[in-house]
Amino acid sequence: MTICANLWLITKRKIKLKQLLTLKINGETHEVWTSTHKTLLEVLREDLYLTGTKHGCELGECGACSVLIDGEPVLACLILPVEVQGQEIQTIEGLAKNGVPHPLQTAFAEQGASQCGYCSPAMLMTAKALLEINSNPDSNTIREALSGTLCRCTGYSK
């Protein structure tokens, strides 16, 4: 095979490894050309520059990458963006409205529930999902809901 033929095959493969996605994120529609192997987390952070969602373990163990898909917490490191086309994706960037922090953000800040802040976006998104289905959860329910997000500096104990 000639060098030109090899380059053509490589170029052809690269084209096939990209896809156009239409994603609804924080109430806005985004069209993005991205690699088919990228996770939702990678597309959010690398292609759309929504870096509030944190990159932790890539194994679904730490919970740092939690976002809401149609109101449900989902680990963005374990899902391909093609799987959530047509669904509403909410990241931490969409929690505040018109520059006004969401009441959960205010409560977290007032209670000192953040030290390094790495787990905070995931905890906030998970807490939001919990409060959508249970507006008055007891402390055990809150602990259980947040248990999927690990905090390395123990800010979760607050």
Predicted feature descriptions by range:
Residues 13-158:
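Signature of N-terminal electron-transfer/Fe-S-associated modules in redox systems
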Residues 1-7:
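Intrinsically disordered, low-complexity proline-rich regions
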